[in-house]
Design a protein with these regions (language model features):
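Hydrophobic cores of alpha-helical transmembrane segments in multi-pass integral membrane proteins
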Residues: 19-37, 41-49, 53, 61-87, ...
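Membrane-interfacial catalytic/cofactor-binding modules of polytopic membrane enzymes
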Residues: 131-139
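N-terminal membrane topogenic signal
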Residues: 8-22
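Amphipathic, cytosolic membrane-interfacial segments at TM-TM junctions
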Residues: 90-99, 166-168
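Low-complexity, intrinsically disordered extramembrane tails and loops of integral membrane proteins
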Residues: 1-8
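Membrane-interfacial hairpin junctions
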Residues: 126-130
Length: 191
């Protein structure tokens, strides 16, 4: 089942997921808020001048790299690759649809956790304390955070909150994948 299915049973199942995925997103947000500050620590790069984006990935190894880079990128790349199969094959394998669906359902809550945690522990303190290290630093961090919004959008497509029909849902799914890839690459370039 994916956004390509048009049966009323599929629409009902998609809508039925809205509440559980919403609860999962709220729980992820609470966890992101309550986690100890993962933006500070020691790492092999101590003393080097770098953006906060790269600094975040360098401290608390390997956990920050896994939480803030590996998990979101694996989910997004899975979505991108399965999206190509779904768009270009007239009858894609069921496992591709299922993989895309599960990655789409998980991506939103993961990014809610990441966004809440980084807004609380990085963006607000850096902004209020004047801690930004120049324009590249701001661009890297903010585009990374903005890249989370399309992944949340994909989850909303998967639960039926966005997309009036299968074609519209497919369109939004593809748009969100593309927007994520652009924003994530801008973050990496400036990071």
């Amino acid at each position: 089942m994916s956004t390509l299915d048009t049966t009323s049973a599929t629409t009902h199942r998609r809508s039925a997921l809205l509440a559980p995925v919403g609860v999962l997103a709220v729980v992820a947000g609470v966890i992101g808020w309550m986690l100890p500050d993962r933006t500070v620590g020691t790492g092999a790069m101590d003393g080097m001048s770098m953006t906060h984006y790269m600094g975040l990935l360098a401290v608390n190894q390997p956990w920050n790299l896994i939480l803030f880079m590996a998990i979101p990128v694996i989910l997004a790349e899975t979505l991108a690759i399965t999206e190509l199969v779904l768009l270009f094959r007239s009858d894609p394998p069921t496992w591709v649809r299922s993989l895309s669906r599960w990655a789409g359902l998980i991506a939103g809550p993961v990014m809610v956790l990441v966004l809440v945690h980084l807004l609380k522990n990085a963006v607000v303190p850096l902004t209020s304390g004047g801690g930004w290290r120049g324009a590249a630093d701001v661009i890297a961090v903010l585009t990374y955070l903005l890249a989370g919004l399309p992944l949340i959008g994909i989850t909303l497509v998967e639960v039926g909150a966005i997309g009036t029909d299968a074609r519209d849902a497919r369109k939004w799914h593809a748009i969100f994948v593309g927007v994520f890839l652009v924003l994530a690459h801008v973050a990496m370039i400036f990071g």
